[in-house]
Amino acid sequence: MSESPKKVIVGMSGGVDSSVSAWLLQQQGYQVEGLFMKNWEEDDGEEYCTAAADLADAQAVCDKLGIELHTVNFAAEYWDNVFELFLEEYKAGRTPNPDILCNKEIKFKAFLEFAAEDLGADYIATGHYVRRVDINGKSRLLRGLDGNKDQSYFLYTLGHEQIAQSLFPVGELEKPQVRKIAEDLGLITAKKKDSTGICFIGERKFRDFLGRYLPAQPGKIITVDGDEIGEHQGLMYHTLGQRKGLGIGGTKDGSEDPWYVVDKDVENNVLIVAQGHEHPRLMSSGLIAQQLHWVDREPFTGTLSCTVKTRYRQTDIPCTINALDDDRIEVIFDEPVAAVTPGQSAVFYSGEVCLGGGIIEQRLPLTV
């Protein structure tokens, strides 16, 4: 008797990547069903969020492929485990990455549990551009084949057990191939542009959105030399390395370097700026990271040479990691790096393999 095909639940977002993922899995002989997750309740009456349109697109794709689409509402889990933490970080003057939190708490936790327990799935699948491979009996995370679209940075919190239960069909393809497949199949999502912005904000204006949940606290903008040159509307609206939107004009006569945010003094509600994108105050020799997640789930001890990204789409930076204690590491860069931002994630790689990462707690200044 032949074994019945394994059941996969694909997280259908209404985008092209998850659409093609579902079709690819059908071709590979899996029993495929879709699941649309609603993670945010629109309470503002304005059609900021495209959830309804995305659901309609996901349904149209599932109809075309002849697969069932389930829907689930994870808005409560999202609010408690992603959004509240996101606001807390902003209040503390840090710059969090909600997409990483969403993958950790919703897509590879709430969704994984729901698919297995309620829908009887053997696997879940998503449209992420990453690959998985087994190394010494443990599933490991690799960068996506399309270096331009690789999303391993957002998935570093996943452990080998979660990866073992997850499939990433488009991770083996390049984006133009994915669009071509969707076009050839006549899928409604073939030409849909990639979603940008944070999942719960959609394309809406970030400043307006944040201002609804956190009261703005205006304060001084001060240069590294201590001169007051303007007022900011709230530290939460600014991130290290930012140049636009400071409201202090570029330069007096156009000949000087523009102003960049180089630091935040949270205690005194002061934004600190300097001229030039390579100003020493903007550069770091390394960082301290905490809340570590290693894909192999082995504790890190000792020292390791590898590469790191301190933000998405950054070129890999050669570095050395030193264990400080169970949940903190010191990372020393081979060369100084600009705009290392507390609250963001530092993600480590050995070649194609994503090793894991942690939250940047502090940056290490250049030693003069």
Swiss-Prot record:
**Listed GO MF terms:** ATP binding; tRNA binding; tRNA-uridine 2-sulfurtransferase activity
Q: Tell me the SUPFAM superfamilies matching this sequence.
A: Adenine nucleotide alpha hydrolases-like
Task: List locations, semicolon-separated.
Answer: Cytoplasm
Decide whether keyword ATP-binding is in the record: yes
Which key words are in the record?
ATP-binding, Cytoplasm, Disulfide bond, Nucleotide-binding, RNA-binding, Transferase, tRNA processing, tRNA-binding
Which coarse location class applies to the principal site listed for this UniProt protein? cytoplasm
Keyword Iron-sulfur among UniProt keywords? no
Q: What class of enzyme is it?
A: transferase
Q: Where is this region: Interaction with tRNA?
A: 149-151, 311-312
The cellular component terms of Gene Ontology attached to this UniProt record, alphabetical and capped at eight, are:
cytoplasm
Q: Which cysteines are joined by disulfide bonds?
A: 102-199
Provide the residue positions that the database annotates as binding ATP.
Answer: 11-18, 37, 127
Documented EC number(s): 2.8.1.13
User: Catalytic residues per the record?
Assistant: 102, 199
Region (Interaction with target base in tRNA) spans which residues?
Answer: 97-99
Q: Which reaction does it catalyse?
A: S-sulfanyl-L-cysteinyl-[protein] + uridine(34) in tRNA + AH2 + ATP = 2-thiouridine(34) in tRNA + L-cysteinyl-[protein] + A + AMP + diphosphate + H(+)
A Gene Ontology biological process term: tRNA wobble position uridine thiolation
Q: Where is this site: Interaction with tRNA?
A: 128, 344
InterPro entries for this protein: MnmA-like, MnmA-like_C, MnmA-like_central, MnmA-like_central_sf, Rossmann-like_a/b/a_fold
Question: What is the similarity comment for this entry?
Answer: Belongs to the MnmA/TRMU family.
**Record function comment:** Catalyzes the 2-thiolation of uridine at the wobble position (U34) of tRNA(Lys), tRNA(Glu) and tRNA(Gln), leading to the formation of s(2)U34, the first step of tRNA-mnm(5)s(2)U34 synthesis. Sulfur is provided by IscS, via a sulfur-relay system. Binds ATP and its substrate tRNAs.
Assembly and interaction partners: Interacts with TusE.
Query: What's the protein name?
Result: tRNA-specific 2-thiouridylase MnmA
Q: What organism, scientifically named, is this protein from?
A: Salmonella arizonae (strain ATCC BAA-731 / CDC346-86 / RSK2980)
**What gene makes this protein?**
mnmA
